[in-house]
Amino acid sequence: MEFNKEKWKEKLEEKLLEKFSVSLKEASSFEVYRALGETVISFIARDWYETKEKYSKTKQAFYLSSEFLMGRALGNNLINLGIDKEVREFLEEIGIDYNQVEDEEEDPALGNGGLGRLAACFMDSLATLNLPGQGYSIRYRNGIFNQYLRDGYQVEKPETWLKYGDVWSIMRPEDEVIVNFGNGSVRALPYDMPIIGYGTKNVNTLRLWEAHSINDLDLGVFNQQDYLHATQDKTLAEDISRVLYPNDSTDEGKKLRLRQQYFFVSASLQDIIKNFKKVHGREFTKIPEFIAIQLNDTHPVIAIPELMRILVDIEGVLWEDAWEIVKKTFSYTNHTILAEALEKWWVGLYQEVVPRIFQITEGIHNQFKNELAQLYPNDQDKQNRMQIIQGNMIHMAWLAIYGSHKVNGVAELHTEILKERELRDWYELYPEKFLNKTNGITQRRWLLKSNPQLASYITELIGDAWIKDLSELKKLEQFLDDKNVLDRIWNIKIEKKKELVEYLRETQGIDINPNSIFDVQVKRLHEYKRQLLNIFQVYNLYQQLKQNPSMDFTPTTYIFGAKAAPGYKVAKGIIRLINDVAQIINGDNDVKDKLKVVFVENYRVTVAEKIFPAADISEQISTAGKEASGTGNMKFMLNGALTLGTLDGANVEIAKEAGEENEYIFGMRVEDIDALIKKGYDPRFPYNNVSGLKQVVDALIDGSLSDLGSGIYREIHSLLMERGDQYFVLEDFEDYRKTQRTINREYKDKYSWAKKMLKNIANAGKFSSDRTILEYANEIWNIKEAKI
């Protein structure tokens, strides 16, 4: 976009007067932020309209996801428009601090972890590549939650990102639809977010649905002074789009989750079919020619019976014809190997919440059951295993595979595990459906925006083509032995570490040494991700430093960031444990110059943008075979952190691309775990035979550490010692500790370390979401570039 200072100033002043009745000189940073956002939208409005018009005439991909973890929009949009520097300078000239303005923006509370961040990266890549694609989700009023720590325990408070509205969401009341449930109906009101591509005029759309009641107020009841019941319908309807992943440990929580899923899927499909009919009328057999729908995990899989409902019940298409359309339209991304995360719904609950959808699901089940009987007449076990409805449970992953034309895993190892184990029956039946699409990240946010110093230096060395083609980074390999380049890469890392130090000092009152090793594990808290292994090693290291104060040791800061699901007690206990150990270590003068532990409160995209560029070590230590892919590992790699990890998920491909000698790989492989399980794993063996491990594990119950009487440490101890150590924390401890000591020693060799950093950056090209999206476009969706 061409930047015209006078036009921007004129438009900004116009917006400030229009919205706040203030001049540019009087405006607060919040008012400037809002006016700046509206100014951006006014300048892209025509391009946005023209993009929609262009896409309406071609095949489009629609990405259905329960979360989109977008991060702040202002800075990212200005960068993608190519006017970030100009806007900063323009604001500074008139005495406005751009950083203060940017800090007025709340992180949109539309996601939680890797699933949502992947979806956000995909939106950026679709727009940048001029591909006709649109996202659909829910406009959560209160998101997942804001995390606070009280006595080291996680406390959840609602996110309030919409308390003053959102400048980037445009309400579209003309596209409102009605969604029907078993016990009534709700209004689905859409809001559109512009997704601005980098270096292009194309502006894609993320459409978010907000739930509203059809009757906000029962006036008769209100006039009887029964105020609570007078607004009951309004409250129940609005609950649907109130929070992401409501606690589902009760039946009411489960019902709300199912209502959420059906709400956003039904609204989205009604919208998609309405727009299809505007162009193609009732030629429904053309749907697969013009519509591709991607199901991001199992949350939106209810879309399969919902599209059947629309086609059969509303449009009068014959069942057999509708089913042919459906299975050519949908594709499904599997994101997990964990059985617990392959969503299942109890028949009674499903029947109550969406009775017609249950009937259709049952019809699909019966149809497939008959097919299975013909395919495997002599294998009743296989027939039973593959049925969509088993006993009283509906298997959504099975419904997804049966109703989709493509099924993809998200890393090479993950896809192989799906084909060989978890989904073996399905792969044998439908080998042509299965393919791999290794996840990716957008380099625009995770390098260009997050690490401008490194981005500028890379551009100085090899030009800026990498911004749209990350494989260009390979050219950096010519500098691997150039000490001037290695010095600069090292110094940029120190600079980013100092920025993080300052941020943590301001926000959490913690002082850390920027010259220490920054060893970072930031991700959702789950037992399989093994934050427990990390903190056990830290506690053991502390004990060693206490026993041997003269031990040769490079100062190290261990940085954690994680949210635990509100109902996940063990995960919350591990957060307490990390903070318990941190309090002991950080308060001990004997180790204060050597060791520090920091738990970053309320980890989110804006904080991640400060952490990834500052990290020396990327902790990717999940139990081998449990992590589907991961994308944090890619963000760390792109910013020059070295991976300390198991051969799991995308770690396998990172080690392959950069060379295993440039990472720190430890622990059992998938085949080692298989062999150990076959032999019989007894956690008491490492507990009794690995030096120092018994002392660490027993600290959970011997009074060395305190859970403040909650009993959760004893629960964790029991999971390890009496319930089989399911994630092999104790078995992998010794190799993990040994690898940590190797890192500590090798960090002292500055040039060797910097060379490994540069090798990682240079080989991060594969992990761009641009590459991933092009593969989806060509091999799954069959969509083509549609540049305006």
Language model: regions and residue ranges:
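A conserved ligand/cofactor-binding region detector
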Residues: 1-788
